[in-house]
A protein has these predicted regions:
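Alpha-helical interface subdomain recognition
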Residues: 48-184
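FAD-binding core of flavoproteins
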Residues: 1-66, 70
Length: 184
């Protein structure tokens, strides 16, 4: 039970407006009837669940990236500066295309990971690319929105925060890159 001696749960808000918890176990005694499997044999089952959860997070991130790109493209098409839409400037068009390419590549790897869920490296590749693409799309989205992108009034900031949190859950880019390197 969660109120057993040695279990400490600390809840806290995350940057994306949700909540998370930190669970600390210290010399927790478990009754024999509560043991789910053989001693020291749980890691493969836990890893399988985490791999599947990573693919689901990548799917959520794909949707967030899609919306972030659409919001940004719409903003630069409609925001006028110097008497014309800022989206008419070629350098901003190139940045928007980079965002689109990153989003599409990440989505493709997510689809591949979902289709090959039991292959040992499919979730790592998707999670690495999702983290890289999410960071690029979030940062570019904020930049292309200008100072307004940092305010709570513009939804792009929320998507950047959510993409940042998704990257951190179940291991960030660096964690999954190292794990992928060990597999291959």
């Amino acid at each position: 039970p969660s109120n057993s001696e040695g279990i400490k749960l600390r809840s806290y808000p995350t940057i994306d407006g949700l909540r998370a918890s930190e669970l600390t176990l210290n010399a927790v005694k478990v009754d024999q009837k509560d043991i789910l499997g053989a001693l020291h044999q749980a890691m493969p089952a836990i890893q399988q669940v985490v791999d599947r959860a990573c693919v689901l997070l990548c799917a959520e991130a794909a949707g967030a990236m899609d919306t972030a790109v659409k919001l940004t493209v719409d903003y630069i098409k409609n925001r006028e500066q110097f008497g014309q839409a800022i989206g008419s400037f070629q350098v901003l068009q190139h940045r928007a295309v980079e965002m689109l390419g990153a989003k599409d590549f990440s989505r493709a790897l997510t689809y591949r990971a979902a289709g090959a869920i039991d292959q040992s490296n499919s979730s790592e590749r998707a999670k690495v690319e999702m983290g890289r693409s999410g960071k690029l799309i979030g940062q570019e989205g904020i930049q292309l929105h200008g100072g307004m992108g940092m305010t709570d009034d513009m939804p792009i900031g929320h998507f950047f925060k959510r993409l940042t949190m998704i990257d951190a859950i179940f291991g960030n880019v660096d964690f999954h890159r190292k794990r992928f390197a060990q597999i291959i």
